Design a protein with these regions (language model features):
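Feature responds to low-complexity, polar/acidic, surface-exposed segments characteristic
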Residues: 12-32
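Substrate-binding cleft of extracellular glycoside hydrolase catalytic domains
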Residues: 135-211
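Surface-exposed substrate-engagement region within the catalytic domains
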Residues: 182-189, 202-253
Length: 253
């Protein structure tokens, strides 16, 4: 998209950086009736994001409108059917439009009752806290009440390191799955809740289907080593690609 947005080809480096974002923001939104290179790029992007039946016609017809709406719905964006700046960013990069209004956040510090209320007043609905970690990183029992009383929903995150392929294996997944199970029980996390295990780096291809998948097989085995009525379900906290592959393998909810 860099080359198509008046960035000279010698400047196009494959990075979706500030120059590309600036040029992309100046492009008019694609809508039904649009045609040309930008539509073709949008169609390729939708295919890359799992919309395999999208045509590569370069024409923004009713079928493309519906595919864009489905993509926006899945990405929790405003459903307009327009391929606007925010939608473009979501198609191209996992972090999407970094200036968009968000509904969720995560933090590695204790959330007071006052802070929880401020988060809710700011429009947040979900907050992520860590089950393990040094210092204030891990959640305390009192925070459950602070979060709940403010009308927020908690999504629990498990992360020891989980930041490289070396930290991804079946044995580590099993060990950490058991730790998450114990930690959830100690904190009083409702049984059946999803614990989101972090993949804090950007693996691709065989790295996801290999070591990362092996780690989550270990996590799943650990959580399923006790009756489901006394356990939790595995989720993943990572890039869109990682989440999609692991879900397609049946390893996460």
């Amino acid at each position: 998209s860099s080359a198509a947005s008046d960035v000279y080809k010698r400047q196009a480096n494959g990075w979706f950086g500030p120059t590309t974002r600036k040029n992309l923001r100046q492009q008019p939104a694609l809508r039904q009736g649009s045609s040309g290179t930008w539509v073709f790029l949008a169609q390729i992007g939708l295919r890359f994001n799992g919309h395999r039946t999208v045509s590569l016609s370069g024409k923004f017809d009713g079928d493309i409108v519906r595919e864009v709406q489905n993509f926006q719905r899945r990405a929790a964006l405003h459903v307009s059917g327009l391929c606007d700046y925010t939608t473009w960013c979501e198609i191209i990069a996992s972090n999407g439009d970094t200036d968009r209004v968000l509904k969720g956040l995560d933090t590695n510090v204790f959330i007071t009752a006052s802070e929880a209320k401020q988060m809710r007043a700011a429009g947040y609905t979900h907050v992520g806290r860590y089950l393990v970690g040094p210092g204030q990183k891990y959640i305390r029992a009192q925070e459950f009440k602070n979060i709940s009383d403010a009308g927020l929903r908690l999504f629990p995150i498990y992360q020891r390191s989980n930041d490289s392929l070396e930290s991804m294996s079946y044995s580590l997944g099993y060990e950490q799955g058991l730790e998450a199970l114990v930690r959830g029980r100690v904190l009083g996390l409702p049984f059946g809740a999803v614990i989101y295990f972090a993949v804090d780096f950007d693996p691709v291809g065989d790295e996801i289907s290999g070591p990362v998948a092996a780690y989550f097989k270990g996590v799943k085995s650990a959580l399923e080593s006790v009756p489901s009525s006394r356990s939790y379900r595995a989720g993943v906290y990572g890039t869109r690609n990682v989440c999609g592959v692991l879900r397609s393998l049946g390893l996460v909810h």
